[in-house]
Amino acid sequence: MKVTLAVLLVLVSSGALAAPDEEALGKSRGYPVCANAQGSFSPEWCLVGVMSHYDSVYPSRVVKKPGTPRPLRRAAPEPALGLDRFLAEHRNTGLLVMRGDTILAERYQYERKAEHRFASMSMAKTVVAMLVGIALGEKKIASIDDPAAKYVPDLRGHPYGETPIRHLLTMTSGVKFEEVYNGHDDVMKLGRAILFQEGPGGAAAVLPYRERVAPPGQRWSYASSETFVLALVVRGATGESLSDYTTRMLWQPMGAESDAAWNIDPAGNEVGYCCFSATLRDWARLGLLLADGGARDGRPVIPADWVKAATSPQAPYPGYGYQTWVSMKQDRFHLRGLRGQAVWVHPATRTVVVHTGVYRIGGNTAAVAQDNFFDVILRAVGN
């Protein structure tokens, strides 16, 4: 049964409420950016500041906006969607709901504003996957069955270099890499090397991970190192920095309204697995582009067949496509990042919900809450 917006207001909206854990998250200190920030593992009191200033906390390269952005309309009056109740219960820095090119609601907490660029965490992985698809469409990548070393010669003879691009896209390289977010695992070691600038950049950063525990394509194991290699593949195939390629082939054709930024490693390579910063509205524009099969106003930006493949189950784990999470309901997909970053997309209704946040690490609380909230939104807008 369709739930009307008026009924939904009565059920789940109770007016603006205080954001959770404001003091613990640094309100009395002005939500600062702390010295020696440790990325998403920074102390709680400076998480809000760090997660909305990644592009200045760590070395970065600008992704330039076009001269004219894609216009977005705004619903007037704003429909009742239950955002205030959701925000009062979850540590979101921002939340935006859009259907088609119309923003239905947009909220910020913890003194964040529309101009803040929010760190993607692993949402960046989907951006990299789309750049792979664009490069494939341009024939700069001949085939995703090519080994990565064809485009990254420094990985010749290494298990990652011998892995077909296809299996890097689906996180099925079979190379051992521990990613459990305990502050001591392989992803933290990689982050220290390339994001915190403590080690080598480029291919040298992944050379320590040499043990193959399964043949490519057989075992799904989430590993940020595989996306880092994919970003190197795009750079090698195109002859451009990932930032310049993102600017020219995605951000400007998409019609972003603000500059974005990629963080870079000590060798100047973009940290493709975690570190793309953009405004909420531009994350929403990206979601709309994907909802429309990679086209803007009917003009292809990302090949449609690539978007379809990337957002459909591709791995032994059925909830994963090409660096993109696929709902078990299979009528939607999402970009997801640590601490509550997410862009949910429902192509049939062109509905996009963007979350940024400073959620606690551990468990699947954020994903479950966001999935349930997305269901509420879909019912409200008339799915």
Residue spans for each PLM region:
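Active-site helix/loop module of the DD-peptidase/beta-lactamase fold
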Residues: 119, 138-178, 209, 236-274, ...
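Short, charged, amphipathic alpha-helices and their helix-cap/turn boundaries
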Residues: 102-107, 149-150, 184-216, 240-259
